[in-house]
Amino acid sequence: MTVRIEKRDRVWTVIHSRPEARNAMDARSAEALVEAFVAFDRDPEAAVAVLWGEGGAFCAGFDLKHGASLAGEARPLEELAYPLDERAAAGQLPRGPMGPTRLELDKPVIAAIAGPAVAGGFELALWCDVRVMERSAYFGVYCRRWGVPLIDGGTVRLPRLVGAGRAMEIILTGRKVPAEEAQRIGACEQVVPEGSSREHAEAMAQQIARFPQACVRADRRSVRMQQGLPLREAMRAEWYNGLPAFVAEGAEGAARFAAGKGRHGEFGDI
């Protein structure tokens, strides 16, 4: 079994385990990851997920040995992934070659990254909401060398994080992007000691899971929706996303604050 799920409280850790291939993705693993994240999104008790690659590598990209067997065959290649609109029209779940990269979840996912997150593995990390990288971890469009394009959101998501110019240079050169540089340019949010990415990602997930979840999801949705919208439309979308959450949770939260909870920025007694 290449994908398994470990649960603690309201946090799911989705583990991709093909260490013999540095967690390179094949079709079976991609499908299993889709199923895992759909189950997570649909579970009312689940709040936050962590994606972690077992064995010291986040993901070395799409398994090129598997891909070589499909060279020149359009039909098998098309069957690896379906665009959002075609899958939706067929009543099927959207899937990319790397698995969940075309899913639009309603809950946050944190990537816990050790070793390489390259080529499609880089795209998989970019699909997540937050990236926690170990000091020796790295990104890179290593597929540049083999004529394999970015088709799992890399050309879409990377510019939104780091800007078009930086993204273009990283994409065109295919060079290695170490963790500290990734954090500096905005492609990663935390750099942590070796061997601790999962621990730190799960700690962050537990913190987020403690908060009122309608509000967490509304704010996350607003951040994602505002990309490319004019300011007025983005502000309107934020309002309509946030209002139901405030009705459901905000008034009760304000009452807890008025009763003395969470004063001076304290998070421990909320």
Q: Where do the PLM segments sit?
A:
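Terminal peptide-recognition signature
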Residues: 14, 18, 32-33, 51, ...
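Conserved CoA-thioester-binding segment of acyl-CoA-metabolizing enzymes
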Residues: 1-56, 68-73
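Short, active-site-adjacent cap segments at secondary-structure transitions
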Residues: 56-60, 118, 223
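C-terminal alpha-helix plus adjacent terminal tail
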Residues: 1-9, 70, 174-179, 199, ...
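Hydrophobic alpha-helical membrane-association signature
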Residues: 29-32, 197, 238
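An acidic, glycine-rich surface segment that forms the CoA-thioester-binding/catalytic face
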Residues: 30-34, 38, 64-114, 268
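Crotonase-fold acyl-CoA enzyme core
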Residues: 100-214
